[in-house]
Amino acid sequence: MSKVCVLTGKRPKYGNTVSHANNHRRTRFEPNLHTKRIWIDEEKRWAKVKLSAKAMKIIAKTGTAELAKLLK
């Protein structure tokens, strides 16, 4: 299962978790992804996509036109 946002391209990042004692251990930071059904007006159909929280805000502001271009 891919952990990549369709609209923004966000993907997991790698870094360190640092404790109070300054011990470092490697960790994977996952993007805040959700599987959503979005209605595409131009094509009159539902599209099931993985979106980050930021992508959902972008769609709320601009509409689904950008997303429709990416899904073609």
Curated annotation (Swiss-Prot):
Family: Belongs to the bacterial ribosomal protein bL28 family.
Organism: Chlorobium luteolum (strain DSM 273 / BCRC 81028 / 2530)
Keyword line: Ribonucleoprotein, Ribosomal protein
PANTHER family: 50S RIBOSOMAL PROTEIN L28 (PTHR39080), LARGE RIBOSOMAL SUBUNIT PROTEIN BL28A (PTHR39080:SF1)
Any Gene Ontology biological process: translation
Gene expressing this chain: rpmB
A GO term from the CC aspect: ribonucleoprotein complex
Keyword ATP-binding part of the UniProt annotation: no
Protein name (record): Large ribosomal subunit protein bL28
GO molecular function, one term: structural constituent of ribosome
Pfam families the record matches: Ribosomal_L28 (PF00830)
